[in-house]
């Protein structure tokens, strides 16, 4: 009886792993936009942190220091949005597991 239960658990774990892999592949294609300076700088990136496009309003081109800050802020905004989306998508797979707070998957 124990052997059958263990086999069932292993099968469930394998199915969860396959589903997580599919979800990660899908998330790698999902795009999120980070914005800073009331839209003066926009960054489009995937949830896999691949930057696809950066849009900069011409009005901020003359102030290098401000532009650098806005680019960093827009990138950070996009990363946060991507991580939140990924967390929501992956939470369905980990809802039954007792993982410590802040634990990130995949390992």
UniProtKB/Swiss-Prot annotation:
GO terms for molecular function: DNA binding. It is found in: Cytoplasm, Nucleoid. This is Nucleoid-associated protein Daro_0807. Keywords: Cytoplasm, DNA-binding. Binds to DNA and alters its conformation. May be involved in regulation of gene expression, nucleoid organization and DNA protection. Belongs to the YbaB/EbfC family. It comes from Dechloromonas aromatica (strain RCB). The keyword RNA-binding does not apply. It holds the Pfam family YbaB_DNA_bd. PANTHER family: NUCLEOID-ASSOCIATED PROTEIN YBAB.
């Amino acid at each position: 009886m124990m052997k059958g239960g263990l086999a069932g658990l292993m099968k469930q774990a394998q199915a969860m792993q396959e589903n997580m892999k599919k979800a990660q592949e899908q998330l790698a294609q999902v795009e999120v936009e980070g914005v800073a300076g009331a839209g003066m700088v926009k960054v489009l990136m995937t949830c896999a942190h691949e930057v696809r496009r950066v849009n900069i309003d011409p009005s901020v081109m003359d102030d290098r220091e401000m532009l650098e800050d806005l680019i960093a802020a827009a990138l950070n905004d996009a990363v946060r949005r991507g991580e939140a989306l990924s967390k929501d998508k992956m939470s369905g797979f980990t809802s039954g597991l007792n993982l410590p707070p802040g634990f990130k998957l995949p390992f």
